[in-house]
């Protein structure tokens, strides 16, 4: 990452650890967000939903074939998955060109990822607790 930042200092900015508020504000200013997917095949990181909620184009670098995040990136209309194990630079260039200055509004993101919203989580917890306490 440092090599790319040094080579393209006006285009790529790498931030060390920052607060959530600063990270979110910085992402809102970005033209494109970059996600480096996990190498674990049993975990979907919550950060991807933060990325989607901003509505910016997201380039996802997928490191493993069975990445559990892939299905979410496939649903998000402004995403491109760059398979690190089988890259296609031409498609990435097309995506970046076509996604320039485009956004997805929050209502659309909330609809696409209804099962990742706070409301869905709260309803699920409420249902589980209701089921537990109704069994007694």
Predicted regions and their residues:
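Nucleotide-activated donor-binding/catalytic signature segment of Leloir-type glycosyltransferases, i.e.
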Residues: 1-22
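Short acidic alpha-helix that forms the nucleotide-activated donor recognition element
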Residues: 19-30, 53
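Active-site donor-sugar recognition loop in glycosyltransferases
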Residues: 22, 40-43, 65
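Short alpha-helical segment that forms part of, or immediately flanks, the ligand-binding pocket
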Residues: 24, 46-54, 70
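Acidic donor-binding loop of glycosyltransferase active sites
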Residues: 27-42
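Short hydrophobic beta-strand element within catalytic cores of glycosyltransferases
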Residues: 32-34, 50, 57-63
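A charged, aromatic-enriched C-terminal amphipathic alpha-helix characteristic of glycosyltransferases
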Residues: 83-131
């Amino acid at each position: 990452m440092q090599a790319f930042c040094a080579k393209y200092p006006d285009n790529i900015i790498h931030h060390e650890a920052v607060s959530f508020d600063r990270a979110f504000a910085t992402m809102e200013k970005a033209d494109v967000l970059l996600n480096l997917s996990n190498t674990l095949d049993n975990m979907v990181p919550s950060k991807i939903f933060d990325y989607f909620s901003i509505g910016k184009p997201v380039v996802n670098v997928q490191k493993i074939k069975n990445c559990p995040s892939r299905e979410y990136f496939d649903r998000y209309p402004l995403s491109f998955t760059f398979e690190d194990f089988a890259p296609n630079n031409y498609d990435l260039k097309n995506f970046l060109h076509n996604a320039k200055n485009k956004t997805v509004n929050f209502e659309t993101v909330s609809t696409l990822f209804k099962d990742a919203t706070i409301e869905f989580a709260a309803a699920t917890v409420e249902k589980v607790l209701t089921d537990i306490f109704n069994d007694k």
